From Swiss-Prot:
Binds 1 [4Fe-4S] cluster. Binds 1 hybrid [4Fe-2O-2S] cluster. Its cofactor is [4Fe-4S] cluster; hybrid [4Fe-2O-2S] cluster. The gene is hcp. GO terms for molecular function: 4 iron, 4 sulfur cluster binding; hydroxylamine reductase activity; metal ion binding; peroxidase activity. [4Fe-4S] cluster binds at residues 6, 9, 18, 24. The lineage of its organism: Bacteria, Fusobacteriati, Fusobacteriota, Fusobacteriia, Fusobacteriales. Keywords: 4Fe-4S, Cytoplasm, Iron, Iron-sulfur, Metal-binding, Oxidoreductase. The modification Cysteine persulfide is found at residue 413. Belongs to the HCP family. This is Hydroxylamine reductase.
Length: 566
């Protein structure tokens, strides 16, 4: 048998699955432990769902279980955590939590929990050696435990959607926003992937329901971000480098960024964002800090070069981590927090009240050299739904006059594959009466191009992070209302989405739930879609891949003059 099996990301080996080491860099041991962590979590969920329905052990659910459910999923997202010891600790914490729940269960509740498998809720090992050995049993804890290819495909599609949802839920959680409804659904979906009584049709329904809850969790995170940090504003962001030492913060957790800015003010250093942290510059409660200098570098996959040039400490608040080469000059100045982790990298200290202590990072930054300037100029951010809707009259006026003919949603992820240059060429060759709506790190393929504007409206509108794809759904629904259309698919909006990891999966499922059809996904279709499941998505939702820029522009009707009236 192969050492591992993982096919959750776009770059999976040969488009079918990694079997000896992950293309992402994770070892077979790490892959097995991540599988075991999810198996452990499902055992916790088997009990917590019973208690939640019965209104029992509320304090335990709110105090420990809810956070565990989302954090365990988040740890297993592509490029989030490579630290086997951290994953082992999370497995042990889950076993302890499961046993704590079990001790409170009646015989009837135990029987209900065991319907997903007696082994799921009763297995137990204490030593790392035993846990590692058990994690190697792919037929029990791994993806391949499901023999039927189509059932496996649907179960994993749900799991990957859940992982993306959990990431967004954790960010909202960190900002004090939670939802009992969302936690209950996470349990339902986790256990749905263990329920052998569910047929393919029922799993398809659960997949779309996952998309429904994806919309809910993105709305929750949007509320969390804006209530704590203000509504994003159109903001120009410097992409050069200053003369002072700096700290580079990567990932997605805006609350960590807020705390870092507050703790580092008046310290003589600057704060820079990296990759998906770029949208932070649009939030009033973040941009008010004078030492919030700009954005440094490009998308996550190019970080080895960017981190070397930056010279100062780097903080990963979440994924995406690229394992450093052995002689990397920056590996002793990288810190992690939340679900992110890498062997040998330092952890950010967490205070008793849950706040972070960034003092060690700040002190290190003071003795580092300033970043090397590798580019200069500015890029514009801050076009989330509130900002775009405030311009609604201007947008509608330009649509009615014919100045704007089409919108192209190019949200999603960036990645290493050379095929992704397609998105740069696609953006460059769009008609001048077309506006790109983007979010996520896919933007790095074209956000530094000079694509101009249409009567003062930039031709690239950046809503923010991957979760801010929610903004384009809000905008689309508003435009549908303004133009009196019966179907959202009648709008002059094309969806050409780039995916890489599981947050893009929940965005896709959310769009499907909202009824959006004919979405194109690239640079390749997911390897975890079996032929039959892919056929269902094609026939029911019009899902398709990409071809060449020239062919796709024709296919999408993206030529001068095409639009709402054509």
């Amino acid at each position: 048998m192969d050492k591992m099996f993982c096919y959750q990301c776009q770059e999976t080996a040969k488009g079918t699955g990694c079997t000896s080491i992950g293309v992402c860099g994770k070892t077979s041991e790490t892959s097995g432990l991540q599988d075991l962590l999810l198996y452990t979590e499902k055992g916790v969920a088997a009990y917590s769902t019973v208690f939640r329905k019965n209104g029992k052990a509320k304090e335990l659910l709110e105090g420990k279980v809810n956070r565990y459910l989302i954090n365990s999923l988040f740890i297993t997202i592509t490029n989030a955590n490579f630290d086997d010891n951290a994953i082992l600790d999370e497995i042990k914490a889950g076993l302890k939590l499961r046993e704590e729940l079990k001790a409170l269960a009646t015989d009837e509740e135990k029987k209900e929990a065991e319907k997903y498998g007696a082994d799921l809720v009763n297995w137990y090992y204490e030593s790392n050696e035993d846990l590692i050995k058990f994690s190697e049993n792919q037929s029990v804890v791994g993806v391949l435990r499901t023999e039927n290819e189509d059932v496996r495909s649907l179960r994993e599609l749900i799991m990957y959607g859940l992982k993306g949802m959990a990431a967004y839920a954790e960010h909202a959680f960190n900002l004090g926003k939670t939802s009992e409804e969302i936690f209950a659904f996470v349990e339902e979906a986790l256990l749905g992937t263990m329920d052998d009584s569910l047929n393919a049709e029922q799993l398809v329904a659960l997949t779309i329901k996952t998309g429904e809850y994806g919309v809910k969790v993105m709305a929750l995170l949007d509320e969390a971000n804006t209530s704590a940090l203000g509504t994003p504003e159109i903001t120009k962001v410097k992409i050069g480098a200053g003369k002072r030492p700096g700290i580079l913060i990567s990932g997605h957790d805006l609350w960590d960024l807020k705390q870092l800015l507050e703790q580092s003010k008046d310290s003589g250093i600057d704060i820079y964002t990296h990759s998906e942290m770029l949208p932070g510059h649009g939030y009033p409660e973040l941009k008010k800090y004078s030492h919030f200098y700009g954005n440094y570098g490009n998308a996550w996959w190019d970080q080895r070069k960017d981190f070397t040039n930056f010279n100062g400490p780097i903080i990963f608040t979440t994924n995406c981590i690229v394992p450093p080469v052995k002689n990397a000059t920056y590996k002793d100045r990288v810190f992690t927090t939340n679900a992110a982790g890498y062997p040998g990298w330092k952890r950010i200290k967490v205070n008793a009240d849950g706040t972070k202590d960034f003092s060690e990072v700040i002190e290190l930054a003071k003795i580092c050299q300033a970043p090397v300037e590798v580019e200069s100029g500015e890029i514009t951010v801050g076009f989330a739904h509130n900002q775009v809707l405030s311009l609604a009259d201007k947008v509608v006026e330009n649509i009615k006059s014919g100045a704007i003919k089409r919108f192209v949603v190019m949200s999603g992820c960036d990645g290493r594959m050379s095929q992704r240059h397609y998105y740069t060429e696609f953006a460059e060759n769009l008609p001048k009466d077309t506006i790109i709506l983007t979010s996520g790190c896919a933007k790095y393929k074209y956000n530094k191009l000079n694509l101009g504007d249409i009567n003062g409206i930039p031709r690239v509108l950046d809503a923010g992070q991957c979760n801010d794809s929610y903004s384009w759904a809000v905008v689309a629904l508003k435009l549908k209302e303004v133009f009196g259309l019966n179907d959202i698919n009648e709008l002059p909006i094309v969806f050409n989405i780039a995916w890489y990891e599981q947050k893009a999966v929940i965005v896709l499922l959310a769009l499907l739930y909202l009824g959006i059809k004919n979405i194109h996904v690239g640079p390749t279709l997911p390897g975890f879609l079996s032929p039959n499941v892919a056929k269902v998505l094609v026939e029911n939702f019009g899902i398709a891949g990409i071809t060449t820029v020239e062919e796709d522009l024709k296919k999408f009707g993206l030529y001068e003059g095409s639009g709402l009236d054509n």
